């Protein structure tokens, strides 16, 4: 568990994150937890795994630098991807979807040769019959993708048999 602990400590101690990793359960953070759960510790030897943050300070010269980018091109954490110097210091950039990969390649001219996609995944779900008289909705993405509008509209609808669950990675 030495390597996994190192990766987790770095993610949690990153001062540039809006929320500490241990307190964050967004998509990228959940994906890292799955990766750590299913891959053996030795898989992370010599790897510097950087979570969705193109910050020069997170590069480690003696490691294989892998940026795992879950953010869209318009987020401040992606800005340094426009710097050829920064991109040259990365060994790999891993994207969470083909769509996100394509947008980054287009926006930042990222070399496809140092990019790959590991699609989002979830644990297996055992489906059980649910009551038909209540509808449960979930908002599972970042707040800046319209959460403020959703909450306002949802409250205005005043629906009696519909519940909205918000699962976001930053404070509202």
Predicted segments, located by residue:
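N-terminal pre-catalytic "stem/leader" segment of glycosyltransferase-like enzymes
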Residues: 1-54, 58
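Active-site proximal beta-strand in glycosyltransferases
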Residues: 47-77, 91-95, 116-118
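Carbohydrate-associated surface elements
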Residues: 99, 121, 170
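A conserved, positively charged/aromatic
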Residues: 80-91
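Short loop/helix-cap segments at secondary-structure boundaries that form the rim of catalytic
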Residues: 42-43, 55-62, 87, 107-109, ...
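Conserved catalytic-core segment of nucleotide-activated headgroup transferases in glycan assembly
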Residues: 124, 131-172
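Acidic anion/phosphate-binding donor-loop and adjacent secondary structure
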Residues: 77-78, 105-106, 116-136
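A short, active-site helix/loop in glycosyltransferases that binds the activated sugar's phosphate group
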Residues: 91-114
């Amino acid at each position: 568990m030495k390597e996994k602990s190192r990766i987790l400590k770095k993610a949690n101690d990153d001062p540039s994150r809006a929320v500490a990793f241990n307190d964050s359960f967004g998509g990228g953070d959940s994906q890292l937890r799955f990766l750590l759960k299913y891959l053996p510790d030795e898989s992370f030897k010599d790897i510097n795994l950087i979570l969705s943050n193109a910050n020069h300070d997170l590069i480690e010269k003696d490691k294989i630098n892998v940026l795992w980018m879950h953010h869209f091109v318009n987020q401040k954490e992606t800005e340094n991807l426009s710097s050829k110097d920064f991109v040259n210091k990365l060994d790999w950039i891993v994207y969470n979807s083909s769509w996100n990969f394509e947008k980054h390649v287009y926006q930042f001219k990222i070399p496809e040769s140092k990019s790959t996609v590991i699609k989002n995944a979830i644990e297996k779900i055992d489906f059980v019959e649910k009551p038909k008289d209540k509808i449960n909705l979930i908002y599972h993405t970042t707040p800046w993708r319209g959460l403020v509008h959703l909450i306002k509209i949802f409250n205005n609808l005043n629906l009696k048999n519909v519940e909205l669950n918000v699962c976001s990675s930053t404070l509202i």
